[in-house]
Amino acid sequence: MELKMEEISEYLKKQIADFEKKADVSEVGIVTSIGDGVARIYGLDNCMASEMLELPNGVYGMALNLEEDNVGAILFGDDRLVKEGDLVKRTGRVMETPVGEELIGRVVNAIGIPIDGKGPINAKTSRKVDVIAPGIIKRQPVKEPLQTGLKAIDAMIPIGRGQRELVIGDRQTGKTAILLDTIINQKGQNCICIYVACGQRRQSVVQVVETLKKYGAMDHTIVVAATASEPASMQYLAPYVGCAMGEYFRDKGMHALVCYDDLTKQAYAYRQVSLILRRPPGREAYPGDVFYLHSRLLERAAKLSDAEGGGSLTALPVIETQAGDVSGYIPTNVISITDGQIYLEPELFYAGVRPAINVGLSVSRVGGAAQIKAMKQVAGMLRLDLAQYRELAAFAQFAADLDKATRALLERGQRMVELLKQDQYVPMPVEDQIMLIFAGTQGHLDDLPVSAIKAFEQGFLSFIRSQKEDIRKEIREKKELDDTLKQKITDAILEFKKTFQP
């Protein structure tokens, strides 16, 4: 085959015309020291705060300390894969996480990588992990109820969509159980739930996922897990990642619920990272910005205005106390940030009162605004009555003869405490809660022995479902009790009591 000179020159001209000068410039630094999940890097002069950095062997980091002569970065991965002298590349992007509907039903780690063995997640969008919370103009007051399905909470410490309600208590008092019941109760409520496991045992996370699968709640839930065996950097980041995933749904006009279990472990992880980065320690060796660590996370929970789509992000953070001390540094910080707290007490838990809520110390600062009118009508004075009952019960231990009114109050209180007990993983529809609390507060249970209350509850609800379904439907639709409806409920209670054998 003979090549003509004209063809060769034409081909060369075409190649020269199509030639593009491509110069790929990337700023590179060198690891000067590495250890305890933190790397010191020299040479990244233009690095941004919270920027993602690319290290060898697929390890990523995030710049936390920007100092004169080096950058302190936390690593998301095994620091044994990185050694002194390794090259570090800037990515030019701050820390991001994959978000979207593709993550629903999956278990991911703190950087959005799936760890449930179901293959990769092809998320179409990503969001910055740490963003500024919505401003005042973008919000509206919390006024829509988020039903937990727990009688004690929905009646006395109501939670609204967009609220931040702290669940606080010692270890093994049922904190996670409240979160799981709330997640299970969101089934069919158009609410996406994100459960963030921070610093927990892997076995505990497996149990949570299995429980959610068993009750069909994984269909609307994302689990973000940063277990105790993972680096402190992952435990520090996980709550922000969970929050960013929730914000995606909030900004689409949907409702989301994020459960942070628990923020005490996040504070421990942040303290560890900060001390290794040589940040000055403050009270209890925490860095000075540990309040900001939690406030900037929890402020992102919001009920957006109608102009912004009307979506909401509700936060249920958990704090673990030591020996019931709510006056510790981290507990007081988070109590002051949130819109109320549910305080769980070991003494009540061991006495068989579950959920073990101390009504006197628990509060919702949103209050009745987050309840439907029917619940406000039946449970308005319940909190006060129960708090009075607790005081009287303590006093009655020393008094031999009590007057009739005091005895009646104690009797009613015992029955209400029994009525508010609830088994785990059986959240109750709000219309059923209203009828039961109505029966208790109107004195229809006063003539029943305390031991028969549970049997009455189960029997009455099955009687209503089989014969008086119209009452449930009416409460659901009207959302308030008029005199006619009250009479219908009273008649149903009296009719059932005729056949009820305690």
Curated annotation (Swiss-Prot):
Coiled coil: none annotated. One of its GO terms (molecular function) is proton-transporting ATP synthase activity, rotational mechanism. GO terms for biological process: proton motive force-driven ATP synthesis. InterPro entries: ATP_synth_asu-like_sf, ATP_synth_asu_C, ATP_synth_asu_C_sf, ATP_synth_F1_a_nt-bd_dom, ATP_synth_F1_asu, ATPase_a/bsu_AS, ATPase_F1/V1/A1_a/bsu_N, ATPase_F1/V1/A1_a/bsu_N_sf. It is an enzyme of class 7 (translocase). The record marks 362 as: Required for activity. One of its GO terms (cellular component) is plasma membrane. It is found in: Cell inner membrane. Keywords: ATP synthesis, ATP-binding, Cell inner membrane, Cell membrane, CF(1), Hydrogen ion transport, Ion transport, Membrane, Nucleotide-binding, Translocase, Transport. Its EC number is 7.1.2.2. It comes from the Bacteria. It is a peripheral membrane protein. Disulfide bonds: none annotated. ATP binds at residues 169-176. It catalyses: ATP + H2O + 4 H(+)(in) = ADP + phosphate + 5 H(+)(out). Produces ATP from ADP in the presence of a proton gradient across the membrane. The alpha chain is a regulatory subunit. F-type ATPases have 2 components, CF(1) - the catalytic core - and CF(0) - the membrane proton channel. CF(1) has five subunits: alpha(3), beta(3), gamma(1), delta(1), epsilon(1). CF(0) has three main subunits: a(1), b(2) and c(9-12). The alpha and beta chains form an alternating ring which encloses part of the gamma chain. CF(1) is attached to CF(0) by a central stalk formed by the gamma and epsilon chains, while a peripheral stalk is formed by the delta and b chains. Belongs to the ATPase alpha/beta chains family. HAMAP family: ATP_synth_alpha_bact. PANTHER family: ATP SYNTHASE SUBUNIT ALPHA, MITOCHONDRIAL. This is ATP synthase subunit alpha. It comes from Thermodesulfovibrio yellowstonii (strain ATCC 51303 / DSM 11347 / YP87).
